[in-house]
């Protein structure tokens, strides 16, 4: 009996020690706990980052030139092309529609031209809708882990709106926000999923009852998508009247830059390092530590940052 009680006391003490460790940012080891503690001081960990490539589309034959010829072609948001890297095929998508530069007549035949390079993101384009019920306490959680939060687009449609509705913009602080601002915030929750948060009527527009929320985003493989090239077209177009258009010829895709800059979700050591520093900086760039934290948020793909103040030079250069 004494051995059993001693063992029970040991187990309870061990569990209590683990619980206490998970209560502090420095000692926590479970990702959900680290993310939750960082959230308390306003830090949102970096999501997965999709590898991006730059491509050009060749001229697209839209048929004989006449009065009914489309004014433009629109490359629809979603899958655009597939590329290969190390014998693996990757899907590349765009989060927003891209409109052709012009439709040009060449010898009685019209061709849609996309003059500007198009940036494509490695991953699968997905969409999720929610209906607002103000009588319930709702949470708008995106079920898919592994999203690139920079590709997240949120639209809110009220009863009076048509189509997807109004495009809300994502923010990371409440500076210059009023009660009419159409904004949302995104925060990581359990299992590397993201939750969308809206305004309360004081900071940001409050959602109306029975509004429809549409979230569109790209789920990516992160770093493994780097290096993909040899793209082949898989996208779809719409004409100026909104109808689907299927090219009669193969759409030529020219690679401008291979896929690069893909990265995995921010790891625990990075969260523990930058969360308190960004909190102390409060988005102000005054001390070297402030710059170190803020630069990482502006350029999230930065591997390392070294900041030296002028006062540390020999001779010192104050104010630099």
Predicted feature locations:
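Signature of Asx- and small-polar-rich beta-strand/turn repeats characteristic
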Residues: 1-320
